Structures are given as C-alpha cells and as structure tokens.
C-alpha cells in the first residue's frame, strides 16, 4: 500500500440518507474493482449495532443496483460500527481503539456542516487525526464567502490543506473531467478556443422535475447556491482553464483557480432569479419564500483568452427538459456570398447521455443559394458502463489523488463571484412550470438567443 493510499475508511452518518443512497453502492463497486481492501468503520448515533448496519447496507444495495454476493460478503468482513454521539468524546475514544494501528485513516463527514467543527476537534483530541489522516467533506462548502472562510479555518486547524478533500460528486462524471482532454488533444478544436473565434458560451442545467420532497433543504439553498456556484463553476473551469504545464493534481487545480480569479463578481444586472408557480406550497417551504428555483447569470472572465466573451449560465427546476450541456457559439462568418449563414457552434452534453456535436452550415439542396444549419454528432454514448460519479470521487479520495477536488482558494473564489447576489439581493420573478424561466430572464440572453437542448426529439 502506497503512502498516499488510506489504510482505513471512517464514515460519519453511517445510518443516514447519503450512506444509504451513495456510499454503500460505491463501496460495493470499489470492492468489485479491487480498489478497496481496508477496514470500513461506520459511526452514528442511532442505537444500532453492527448486524443492523449490515442489514442496512444490504437493503441499500438491493435498491441501488443489486447485491453482488461476493462483494457484499467482503463488505461484511470489513465493516465495523460505533454507535455514539458526535458531541461525546467517548465516541472518538472508541474510534481510536477500533482504528488500531491505522496511521492514514480517511474520515468521511457525511453529516450536516453544522457538526463539522465538533467532529474535527474531537478527532484531533482523541488522537484519530495523525499526520497521515485526511478528512473528506461534502458540498456545500459554506453558504457564502464568510461561512466558507469560517469552515476552512475549522478544517485547517487540525488538517493541512493537502489532507482536506472537498467532494463535489459532479466532478466524478466522466464527461465533466474529459472536457480538458477533448480541448487540448484535438488540433481542429484548440486553435479556435479563444476570444478571437468564440462569440459567447452558454451553459444550461435544466431539470423537468421539482424539489421532490426536499423542500426543507432546498429552501435553505436555492439554485445559485445549490448548483451554479459549485457544479456549473466546475464545468466552466474545465472549459476556460489554460492547459496545465504538468498533469499533476496541483498544476491542474492551479489553472482552475486562475479562471475563478479572473471572473468579475456578479452584480444585479448580471442575474435574473425565478421561482416556479406553486413552489411555496411544497412541504417544508416557507409560504413567503424568496428562494429561487431558477437563475440566469452572465459572467465575464477577464483573462487573455476570454476577455470580452460573455458566458451565460441558466439552471432551474420544472423546465421543459432534463439536460446539462455547454454550447460555444463561434463568431459569424463574413456575409459576402451567403447572408443567411449562421454561426457555427460546439455542443458538449454532459447528461442525460454524453454527446459532442458541431453545428455547421450546409447548402440547402432544395433552394439555390440558401443555407441551413446541420449538426454533426462527433461522439455519443449513454455511459452504461461508466463508473458512478460517487464511486469515482471516493476512490480518488482514498487513493490520495486530489485532481478532482476543490482547494481552499478555489472554494473562496467561487463564493466571491456570487456573494453580492445571494439571497434577496435581486428581484424574484414567478415562472410557469414547463417554461424556460420567467420573462425578465430575456435580459440575460446570449447573442442570437439560447440554443435550447433537444432531448428525445423535443426541446419544447
């Protein structure tokens, strides 16, 4: 086992929803691949014992992909359980005993951020945070710039930055982290990937469903906090970053941070927020809620490559389709011969199926001198054999590969950009279910308009 590989996995919140839906299925997948062979220690305050946690693990697997008999048998061999409160130091003393000689444990905090400080401090006090230990935390990394800085101070008090793993499972999606490879490995593409040739970039993350019973959580977040500040900024970083000088994790993360440092902080004229009609009647939602379920934003990246190129992001719930994609619209060709020639574009779809397509002009065979836009599909796959995003990020976290994870400076720069427009800093507009957001969002529209995603033959 290498010095970067952890020698024990501890996950707090072992009886919770995240463990049930994501962690146990990821553990089984890792065991099947041969990438996990260390003690797995669950910690929670539920009055459970090991047998009941094992039953919970089996039930999780039955409802999320199925039980692999051999892999589940191995999970049972590796699994331990400590029942106790996070405020009780005795819980952590028991954890220390259970860890035994482990010197590089990974502590996964699958718990609310309000408990992070207590758990991290007790880990250190009980001797569970030796120099080789690491701590894994889930997004959200704070609620704004001030809380993100406070959270980082808590973590850095007992762990060095190299030992802090900030997980955003979205980066585990293969199409997201393959964007840079596509950019720099294709000589047809990279030379035009700059302000000289790109007119604008648009990112869409649309969902055709609502809050799905998560109203109480969603009403504390909203679209900007929930997906734009993290998921979509990560996509943007991969699109806009410079090719790193080396392929090590720090070189790649350095370039991503440079992108965020180049983005102007958002102002009121750069954002339109919306809320779908009926949101305030959802369970757990305040009847006077000012939380957005839709947002459209315009960004400017003041780097040499992207100076003057507007970048548009929109995301929301109960929109016409469920789809996440990027479209880069190239500058319009000179109108010398054919006045109706439209700008070319590159479309990079992340979900529901990964797809790369190019929009080109061709001459209409039915009308002389008239062109039409056609789309060439360069790559398409449904990702049936693709590793689950949680499995990917958890595997990398345990192996010590930090490439996909947000660094302290990245997190704080992302919050800096959105901080001025959080909460009720801008007006909230109502929109109808199945629409592309409120009418005022037309004020934040790319040149030439949005290219709406087409899924299953319709964009509605």
Placement of each model-derived feature along the sequence:
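Secretory/organelle targeting and membrane-embedding segments
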Residues: 1-136, 141-460
């Amino acid at each position: 086992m290498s010095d970067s590989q952890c020698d024990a996995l501890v996950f707090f919140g072992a009886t919770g929803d995240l463990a049930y839906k994501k962690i146990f299925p990821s553990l089984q997948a890792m065991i099947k691949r041969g990438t996990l062979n260390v003690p797995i220690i669950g910690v929670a305050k539920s009055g459970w014992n090991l047998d009941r946690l094992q039953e919970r693990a089996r039930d999780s697997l039955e409802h999320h992909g199925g039980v692999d008999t051999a892999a589940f048998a191995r999970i049972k061999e590796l699994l331990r359980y400590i029942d106790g409160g996070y405020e009780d130091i005795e819980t952590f003393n028991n954890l220390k005993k259970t860890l035994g000689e482990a010197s590089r444990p990974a502590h996964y905090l699958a718990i609310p951020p309000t408990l992070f400080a207590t758990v991290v401090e007790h880990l250190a006090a009980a001797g569970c945070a030796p120099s080789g230990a690491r701590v894994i935390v889930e997004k959200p990394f704070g609620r704004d710039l001030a809380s993100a800085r406070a959270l980082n101070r808590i973590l850095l008090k007992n762990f060095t930055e190299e030992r802090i793993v900030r997980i955003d499972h979205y980066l585990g999606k293969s199409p997201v982290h393959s964007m840079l490879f596509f950019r720099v490995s294709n000589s047809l593409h990279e030379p035009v990937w700059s302000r000289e040739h790109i007119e604008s970039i648009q990112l869409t993350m649309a969902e055709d469903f609502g809050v799905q019973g998560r109203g109480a959580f969603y009403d504390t977040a909203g679209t900007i906090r929930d997906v734009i500040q993290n998921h979509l900024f990560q996509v943007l970083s991969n699109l806009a970053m410079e090719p790193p000088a080396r392929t090590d994790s720090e070189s790649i993360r350095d370039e991503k941070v440079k992108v965020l440092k180049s983005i102007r902080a958002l102002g009121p004229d750069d954002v339109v927020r919306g809320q779908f009609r009926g949101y305030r009647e959802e369970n757990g939602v305040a009847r006077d809620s000012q939380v957005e379920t839709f947002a459209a934003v315009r960004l400017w990246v003041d780097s040499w490559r992207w100076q003057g190129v507007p970048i548009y992001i929109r995301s929301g719930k109960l929109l016409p389709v469920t789809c996440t994609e990027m479209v880069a619209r190239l500058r319009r060709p000179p109108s010398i011969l054919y006045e109706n020639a439209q700008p070319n574009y590159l479309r990079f779809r992340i979900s529901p199926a990964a797809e790369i397509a190019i929009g080109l002009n061709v001459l209409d065979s039915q009308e002389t001198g008239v062109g039409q836009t056609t789309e060439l599909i360069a790559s398409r796959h449904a990702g049936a054999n693709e590793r689950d995003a949680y499995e990917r990020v958890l595997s990398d976290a345990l192996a010590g590969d930090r490439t996909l994870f947000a660094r302290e400076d990245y997190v704080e720069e992302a919050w800096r950009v959105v901080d001025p427009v959080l909460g009720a800093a801008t007006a909230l507009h109502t929109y109808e279910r199945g629409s592309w957001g409120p009418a005022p969002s037309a004020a934040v529209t790319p040149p030439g308009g949005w290219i709406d995603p087409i899924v299953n033959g319709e964009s509605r």
